[in-house]
Amino acid sequence: MPENEAKIRLDRFLANKLPEYSRSRLQQLVRTGFVRLNGATTRPRHLVRSGDKIELTEAPLEKIDNQPEPIPLEVLFEDKDIIVINKPPGLVVHPGAGHRQHTLVNALLSHCPTLSGIGGKERPGIVHRLDKETSGCLVVAKNDGAHRELSRQFAERRVEKIYLALVAGKLSKEAGVIEEKIGRHPVHRQRMSVASARGRPAKTDYRVVCSGDQASLVECRLYSGRTHQIRVHLHHLGNPVLGDKVYAAQLAKNFPRHMLHAWKLGF
């Protein structure tokens, strides 16, 4: 354990070093004894220290037990290693609490029965995510080699991620950079905030594509991937995404969902 990386949670340390694994998957490996700290089992929240020895035993890949569902998919690109999907709004990416069926994973298993198992049984092939109501480009790994390579590129911030957002009002500048840190809201735990004392670095470039009296179309380029990053940063500017029930509920009633689309994905 290098001294400059000491005193952080074990699961966070592992997530930084092993981007191909989701944090929930790593927490599961710690709890089930596949990760040992100084030869002993431990807990995901244990704070690692300089000089600690961490051992990870490769766990067998989990058998995928989600059921295929014939949900139509718009495939933008596909080869033997990856699939790029234009995800529709309203579709949850992977099964979780409250969404055990009718997800993108169920649709993918119908389209392509073999997917990478690195993400665990609930997230086969899933390398990154989009919020339920966000539409647009999402890449999925068909095999473990593709999963590891894509995860590495995302972790190294080499993936180009460009979004289009329809926001309220006119922006004060035609283009700019937002670098406010983002963390969990101190009171509303389902929200993220730039006011969090434990915020993590986040960077969003933006450019106004066109604007009218009441709304603007904005192109946003992400250099990090914090939860709700674009929605939080644009809300911070005073130009929230239209239709956003979480950050601008008063402006959401006339829209079926928040107006955010993952336009381009380059890797």
Regions found by a protein language model. Give the residues of each.
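RNA pseudouridine synthases
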Residues: 1-267
